[in-house]
Amino acid sequence: SPTQRYEITVELVDPPADVKNISGAAYFSIPDVICMPTPDRIAGYTPGSRYEKKFPLVPTGNNTYRGHIFLDWPIDEDYYGLGVCKWELAYVDATVARSNEFLQITRLSSAELLSLSDATAYCREEMRDKFDKTCFTPSDPARAEELGLISYLVKVKPSRTN
């Protein structure tokens, strides 16, 4: 039974009116794939070394949504008789679905989650096409100011709960 729980809070600041829903997904990987068989040694491809777990983000009022993840959702074990495979969180995505069927994604890295750091992203209010789905986290203040004129903010905040 999972025990390493983190709450994920997503806040939309001045979102567009056509936001339909928000969902979350946690992505895990096995960084050291020595524990897994490699069917194609030349390509280095190892199937099954990634795991995705979707989780709901429930509205709590004022354009704020909450959900939770567990770092120990995937189970560390010896799947193939080659040693214990250890899963690690790679990142967490918050996906905003718009009424035009376009999606916008804000990513929280495992380093941000483990250090309990917030992530703020700029998502375009007017999406050009379905490929315009990445929300940006610029480090340059001038770029952030420029994006601020055409974007709404998505703030993702992790907290440890147990």
Regions found by a protein language model. Name each.
Residues 2-4:
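N-terminal amphipathic/basic membrane-interacting segments and domains
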Residues 7-13:
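Short edge beta-strand/loop segments characteristic of extracellular beta-sandwich folds
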